Structure formats: structure tokens, C-alpha cells
Amino acid sequence: MKLQVLPLSQEAFSAYGDVIETQQRDFFHINNGLVERYHDLALVEILEQDRTLISINRAQPANLPLTLHELERHPLGTQAFIPMKGEVFVVVVALGDDKPDLSTLRAFITNGEQGVNYHRNVWHHPLFAWQRVTDFLTIDRGGSDNCDVESIPEQELCFA
């Protein structure tokens, strides 16, 4: 099956998580007016008294055409990925309780100035870079037993 890749927007992505960006977001000044703070752009949620981790993930570019075979989810915490050098990347998401609901499967491409924060329990494809090796600032839950993986019927990304 072919999966159409759409431009990422908060409206289109809201069921799956938060879009982390400054475009069309409110801010206030701090540090004597030298800094614009775009405050509270995503909800970081961590359950079971674990701690929040800040990491850097260095992702390799996917081979094209990319065929998807599995999705994962994290029931005990949100997971955010923010490209550190303005790189475009693709995210694939789905809703579903015990297994991904393929009727909700969506693919989005960022504009190079966006990150994403997946809600808890949102199915998503494992992180990959798009055109070149990409470093992602990653905010997620420390601890074990927080990753469910499910196979899905083959899906090939299709760009308009």
C-alpha cells in the first residue's frame, strides 16, 4: 500500500501529539528583552515516577523508496524529537489501543523548523533521518519496559 506524505501542521497532527515550532505561536520577552520565550510548546508526560531524559539521537538517512514494516509506541511517556540543525524529516503515526489502527495511519513531512512530541501510546515509526545524517534533541522517559512494537502490512511512503 502507498501512504501519502502530508505537510506537518498542528491541526493535522493534534490527535497524535504536538508540533514544536515558533511559527504562529505566542511568546514573551525574558532576560531584559534579549530573548523571546516560546513557552509550553508541548506536554512532556512521564508516568511511574521515572525521570525525564534529554538525549541526542544521531539518525541515519533511510534508503528510498522507504517501505514501512512496523510501528512502536511508548505507554509510559511522551517522546519528543527536535532536529538540531534545521533538517527536514518524516514522521509516520497511527492511533490504536492494542494494535495500530491502520485507518488512522498518517505520514507527515516537517518544514525544517519543526519538531514533534508524540503523545503517550501513539503508534509511530522508529526515528530515521530524511536526506542526511541528522542529530535530534530527544526528550523522553528513562527506564525500561516502555516500548511496544507491532508489525504492520507493508506501506510505501508516497510524496505528492
From Swiss-Prot:
Pathways per UniProt: Nitrogen metabolism; (S)-allantoin degradation
Which key words are in the record?
Lyase, Purine metabolism
Per its UniProt record, the required cofactor names are: Ni(2+)
Recorded catalytic activity of this chain's protein: (S)-ureidoglycolate = urea + glyoxylate
The keyword Lyase belongs to this UniProt entry's keyword annotation? yes
**UniProt-listed InterPro entries:** RmlC_Cupin_sf, UAH_cupin, Ureidogly_lyase, Ureidogly_lyase_bac, Ureidoglycolate_lyase_dom_sf
**Domain of life here?**
Bacteria
Q: Hey, which family's this protein in? A: Belongs to the ureidoglycolate lyase family.
Q: What is this protein called?
A: Ureidoglycolate lyase
Protein species of origin: Escherichia coli (strain SMS-3-5 / SECEC)
